[in-house]
Amino acid sequence: MPENKNDKENKNDKENKNTKEEKKKVKFSNIIWVYIIFAVFFIGALISLNWENNPIISYSEMLSLINDGQVESMKINQNGNVEILSKDGTTYESFSPALVIDKQYVNSLIQKGIKVEYVESVGTKWWFGLLINIIPIVVMVLFFFWLYRSASAGARSSMNFGKSGAKKYEPIGEKVTFKDVAGIDEVLDEIEDIVKFLKNPQEFQELGARMPKGTLLVGPPGTGKTLTARAIAGEADVPFYYASGSDFVELFVGVGASRVRDLFKTAKENAPAIIFIDELDAVGRQRGAGLGGGNDEREQTLNALLVELDGFDTSTGVVVMAATNRPDVLDKALLRPGRFDKKIMVGPPDVKGREEILKIHTRKKKIAPDVDLKLLAKRTPGFVGADLENLVNEAALIASRKKKNQVEMSDFEEAIDRVLTGPSKKYRIISDKEKKILSYHELGHAVLAYLLPNTDPVYKITIIPRGAGSLGSTLQIPEKDKYLIKKSEILDRIVVALGGRASEKLVFNFATTGAKDDLRKATDYAKSMIYRLGMSKRMGPVYWEGEEEEIFLGSELTKQRNYSEETAKELDVEVKKIINSMYDKALELLKQNRERLDLLASYIFKNETIYGEEFKKLMSKDLEELKEYIGGEKEINEFLKIDVVNHVNYQPV
């Protein structure tokens, strides 16, 4: 008769309890042996400290002491050993059998005032000597016995070395369920079948259907792959065994394979159950691509995993799940149907998903009424679940730092800035000369972003230093999520990226290091157009990006180039052509709006930060109205008088 679920759980709990009790006994026994050895050494040290080492004198020296009247008392035993106490308190030992026999001489000693006493033993007690001889032997015996026990324990430990290190997930407090997962509704729809199968497998088997043997969750870090697996365990209410891929790989060949077999054995014994392997790429990388024989252990572990996935019966009720953010390096045999035959993409959430995730993470926070989660979701494109959780926590920390009772919208906006660009450098002192350069640089980006039709709206312009190397920033946030980008949009993005350098050229006629990141972005956009997207008329709709050569277990060491040197030169020429033409366009647009650029630069020089709504109003005003709004001619002239060229050593363009 097969065991029911409760019997199996009771059996498993009993085994775990017995294992814990055995560990406690072994630990207690080891402590006792340590105390015994310590006690033996302590007694030996105590005996050695109390050892009476009296000086031994000859018979003639003893007679000399007696004749000189220096003896206070004498103790004599039947063997002729004599203990002499002198009047100055010194104790001597000597040997004189005659004192045992010659009673007359002893009487003469008594007449001289010497106290004479016959005793059984003289000097060092007999058991002291016995202990001194026995203690080293006892210590050696105990030491070797302890070594023997340690070796036995080591043998037992080595027997357990191949045991799986997978942990059984036991939630503390409330279980994680699908209510705690948001922003990935399509993923939850896909994995709902797994929960139904674990709860009622007969429903599937009656129709002749089988569950996929392995389900692979694929997606960028922080999208909720592990959280999804925990939610499945909470919904299905079955044992959930989880391990990291790195837990299986050890120094010794064969250990990882043994752990894989042990994990599947444990799961089968407690079926229905879920096995979840996080970071699968640590153990499931491509075989046979290594530069040497150092990956034998990894390959054996992978082979064992392949056998277990293909070898166990799906009717046992064991579901295998895994997560990775590097599906490109996984072994092809691992992904074939019959193993991890169901792949679920867990991507970044859209704006609606981000709003739902923010609702979950703000449930237990004291949120002010002015907080608009829908607006926050729009302002955080590209954020994944982990980023949003960090954002909410950062906002709560900011509010706490300001001694607020609730987390306000301003705290969330500051948290967005901290997450995107790092904390503000409040105590970094920037000279007026460099501040003026930063003002023109950032306004160069912002003005072009406003003028060009295919760019995202400006959210914030600031010349406050943030993070490691950012002296200022112009943040643009899309109004909605985009999945396709037109060529005209990419070109406009390049123009905006080059706006800072173009503004420096136009106003100061020199270049600064502040445009380094802008140039990298512009170059990446241009290379993508030519090498990967086929957006060049001259080079045609061809994908020129080289194939990645996976030299060592999927790591990208080089890229194989499948075109000639002449073609490579032509590709580089096309990239430069795009960059140069967009730079010229940026310069021309800024020239046409030079007066507005000066006015806005003086405004941000004074205020340091301009938000999107205010920036739109400033750009929509006519020049006279804008000049009056900023503060009039006097304020603008003071800003323009700041001499930058003669005081700052910058490289001319």
From Swiss-Prot:
Catalytic class of the enzyme: hydrolase
Keywords carried by this UniProt record: ATP-binding, Cell inner membrane, Cell membrane, Hydrolase, Membrane, Metal-binding, Metalloprotease, Nucleotide-binding, Protease, Transmembrane, Transmembrane helix, Zinc
Record-annotated active site: 442
Cofactor or coenzyme needed: Zn(2+)
Disordered: annotated span: 1-20
GO function term, MF aspect, one: ATP binding
Transmembrane portions of the chain: 31-51, 127-147
Topological relation to the membrane, as annotated: Multi-pass membrane protein
Gene3D superfamilies: 1.10.8.60, 3.30.720.210, P-loop containing nucleotide triphosphate hydrolases, Peptidase M41
Binding-site residues for ATP, renumbered to this chain: 219-226
Assembly mode: Homohexamer.
HAMAP family: FtsH
Protein name: ATP-dependent zinc metalloprotease FtsH 1
Organism: Petrotoga mobilis (strain DSM 10674 / SJ95)
Gene: ftsH1
